[in-house]
Amino acid sequence: MNKILPEMKSTQNLISSSPPPPLIPLKSNTSLSNLNSKITPNILLIIIILSIIFFISGLLHILVKFLLTPSRESREDYFDNVTALQGQLQQLFNLHDSGVDQSLIDTLPVFHYKSIVGLKISPFDCPVCLCEFETEDKLRLLPKCSHAFHVECIDTWLLSHSTCPLCRSNLLSGFSSHHNLSSSYLLVLESEQSSRDMVPVLESNSQLGYDVNNDSESTRIRSGRKSCDPDGDMDGLDEKVVPLEVKLGKFRNIDHVGEGSDQKKNSISGNSKNVDGRRCLSMGSYEYIMDQEATLKVHVSTKKLSGKDRVPSHRTVMSECGFDPTVKGIEKSVVERESFSLSKIWLRGKKEKQKGTSARDSDCSFVSSSSLRFPNHRIPPEESLKSENSESLETKTPSFARRTMHWLAGRQNKIVQPSTSNV
């Protein structure tokens, strides 16, 4: 025990003699003092000036965007003078293009490929489907840029685009509301009937020219046959044949230039009909080259209406009218709400096609320059009286949206179909 006690005392003396650990200095006060020393009034002044500049530039941008934008007339003038490159840039930036209305597509002229004046032996190509034009193919012409395409190809394209697929020129600028009011010519091909058929709507008399008067506008439709008019009065129509220029081209390989290129072109054009009327252009680089030397034209018949037949309002198109089996409904709506363009044939059923062909066979023969064909079906006076008496008893078919709402609400409404008399 005597030995252990002095050893414990010695260890305590050693522990007490060791220096204490150093204290950690506080850096918070030093960092704040450093920031205060670094931020000077000059830096604060620069930050304030930059923020004011950005604020003023944003206000100027808003003023330029909303207050200094060009008017509608200047926009139309700009689109009329737009170039091909500007049209391509516009198509790239305006990806929300909803296309052209079907009624506007139906007004574009249609012609046969064989009716082109100045056509050479070598066939031209369609830039949309990459197929060669054949003699019996129907082409639709864009009068603004004079480019022609297959009817099915260009109709499908224009339903989702409002520009030419080749030069990207805007079609809507040439068919604005102001242009429609000032234009009094209707382009109809001389050797081709229109792609739209008229529903058999006639009055009790035997005249084919009639007026349809509405509260908002009046539309006058005249046929082009003098023998159908008992008085022979055709003062409202003046026919002129105007040749229109047609620009066509063909695909050529730009990788092989020389003597072998002509042979390859001929082999491509000769073997193009082997694969479902289409060619494979995935190998190599091809360009659609226009034939600048060839002067291709199509003779088009124009009809000029007199001053009393011109309507100072928007022209009623075929696809904007409804159809009612009664006589009063016929006077209000001249045609069915359907477009008879070739691009929408697949939407109609077989029965409807058979009805259209039978009605077409019974129509009276018009001249080929007439843009609208009126089937010669008369409405008997007895049937007209029956339809007038039964008009109050007939209930119109509700719309699809209303039927859907009734179905969702759980209602069961009886829909009475109007009985149409077969003429």
UniProtKB/Swiss-Prot annotation:
Pathway(s) the chain acts in: Protein modification; protein ubiquitination
Q: Which UniProt keywords apply?
A: Membrane, Metal-binding, Transferase, Transmembrane, Transmembrane helix, Ubl conjugation pathway, Zinc, Zinc-finger
Region described as Disordered: spans on this chain: 213-236, 377-399
Any one Gene Ontology MF annotation carried by this entry is: zinc ion binding
Presence of the UniProt keyword S-adenosyl-L-methionine in the record: no
Is Zinc-finger tagged as a keyword?
yes
The Gene Ontology biological process annotation of the record reads:
embryo development ending in seed dormancy; protein ubiquitination
Give the way it sits in the membrane.
Single-pass membrane protein
Swiss-Prot/TrEMBL catalytic activity? S-ubiquitinyl-[E2 ubiquitin-conjugating enzyme]-L-cysteine + [acceptor protein]-L-lysine = [E2 ubiquitin-conjugating enzyme]-L-cysteine + N(6)-ubiquitinyl-[acceptor protein]-L-lysine
Q: What is its main location?
A: membrane
Segments crossing the lipid bilayer? 43-63
Enzyme's top EC category: transferase
Intracellular or extracellular location(s): Membrane
Which cellular components does GO assign to this protein?
Answer: membrane
Q: What is known of its domains?
A: The RING-type zinc finger domain mediates binding to an E2 ubiquitin-conjugating enzyme.
General function of this protein:
May be involved in female gametophyte development.
What family does the database annotate?
Belongs to the RING-type zinc finger family. ATL subfamily.
Q: What is this protein called?
A: Putative RING-H2 finger protein ATL49
* Species of origin: Arabidopsis thaliana
Tell me the lineage of the source organism: Eukaryota, Viridiplantae, Streptophyta, Embryophyta, Tracheophyta
Tell me what gene encodes this. Answer: ATL49
